[in-house]
Design a protein with these regions (language model features):
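Conserved subregion of the PPM/PP2C metallophosphatase catalytic domain
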Residues: 1-110
Length: 110
């Protein structure tokens, strides 16, 4: 599953980009809603549900709030540093638990 992309603004606020449709490639034909936004000096974070669903041995998922809090600390970082930092945060969270779902994410910045 693909959760709504997160547009992280320079002031630390964020917006979920929910316009669209189902995951790409599942249906032969489907009309997607089209939306627009200006990236400006914001950060765009696209990800699969495996990121927020990553669970530790106490059965606590990583969750959206923890993801947004992490992204707030990375607003001035390069996309590659954000990705490596998030991989580290996820590993620290799940520790020795097996990865149960894919964790795919993409960071875009100007």
């Amino acid at each position: 599953g693909h959760n709504p992309a997160i547009l992280m603004k320079k002031d630390g606020s964020h917006e979920l980009l929910e316009t669209g449709g189902p995951v790409l490639g599942v249906f032969d034909s489907f009309e997607f809603e089209q939306g627009k936004f200006a990236l400006g000096d914001s950060l765009l974070f696209c990800y699969t549900d495996g990121v927020v669903d990553a669970t530790n041995n106490a059965e606590e998922p990583f969750e959206m709030e923890r993801l947004v809090d992490f992204l707030k600390t990375q607003l001035d970082s390069a996309p590659s540093r954000i990705c490596s930092g998030l991989r580290r945060e996820l590993r620290n969270h799940i520790k020795d638990m097996p990865q149960l779902d894919d964790m795919t994410f993409l960071v875009l910045k100007k």
